[in-house]
Amino acid sequence: MIKLRLRRMGKKRQPHYRIVAAEARWPRDGRFIEVIGYYNPRTDPYTLEVNVERARWWLEHGAQPTDTVRALLVRAGVLPPRQQNEAKRETAETAQPEA
């Protein structure tokens, strides 16, 4: 399975990340198929650059983003934000624990 995930770069205690498409079984900092963008959380404000066209192509072809990459793709405008299921929320509120 292909994953969109972060690949750590940089010096010790100074990380920045590349957003890559890689096989899920490959090591985090090992082989990858393609670099899609980069993310630097150490700058103020953070730096995020994503090739939107390639990210959408990978998502259309079945690549699964990790939770962190999903959040970054939402910030970049590639993915819509997750919507909470209204029905699930209502049942949780109406269900009262029996005492």
From Swiss-Prot:
Lineage: Bacteria, Pseudomonadati, Thermomicrobiota, Thermomicrobia, Thermomicrobiales
Keywords: Ribonucleoprotein, Ribosomal protein
Gene Ontology CC terms: cytoplasm; small ribosomal subunit
Family the entry assigns: Belongs to the bacterial ribosomal protein bS16 family.
Superkingdom: Bacteria
Region (Disordered): 80-99
GO molecular function, one term: structural constituent of ribosome
Protein's recorded name: Small ribosomal subunit protein bS16
InterPro entries: Ribosomal_bS16, Ribosomal_bS16_dom_sf
